Amino acid sequence: MTSAANKIRKAQTNDPELIAQINKISTVAAAMWMTVVGTLGILFLPLMVGGIISELGFTEKLAGYIAAAEMAGVAVVSGLGVFWVRRINWVTIAILSTVLFIAANWISTGVTEYWPMFASRFLVGAASGALLAIGLACQSDSKNADRIFGYWVACQMAVSSAGYILLPGVRATWGLDGFLFALIILGLTAFVSIVFLPARGLNRASAQEKQANKILTSALALGGALFFFMAQGGLWAFLERLEHSCMLSKLLFFFQI
């Protein structure tokens, strides 16, 4: 019994080298960028929706379903991350997810039918969700997790701002395929982050008496996030179509975003 207890205690003890690695600037930066790559599809969803409507001739209803498929992929895989993100090798999953992100975006460039596009965008979302879950888990293990989360949001908004200045021109010049290839190029940068990523995170085992409070607060936080993104998601996907219906200048509209 004593031997078994010692093994469990040892397994629950975090390696000092792992703690040091997770708090390195290179690891923090890698985790931040990985989460940015994991949100690229959602950040630039209006450009994708506008492209499949104007270039592929999909109705707004079908385009909405395709956008929902991509967001569902992110939600399902990142949501299930509570079960797998502490149990699976981060580097392996990050490599597979990045390959899937690139491959699914590449497949999307040759698709003109609804169901293949629906499936490919769901796969993009699933890959994005895995990268997002790993990146956020790595950030949360840092000793300055709250501050790093703020830096990540700032980085995400900076990338979004630059993207909405540059990517509309890319789509106008090279079409929807050009936009998707831009996502592929950005996705390739995730491999750089993987180089600095630890294979696993810290052990998050906690005392039983604290679990009830954690479950309650987590449920409230998740509920609030759910309602926020439900309100935001439907409008966000069709943001470019609002510009189109109001006949605004695309350059000015995306610059304002």
Segments (PLM) and residue ranges:
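Glycine-rich segments within core transmembrane alpha-helices of 12-TM secondary carriers
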Residues: 146-165
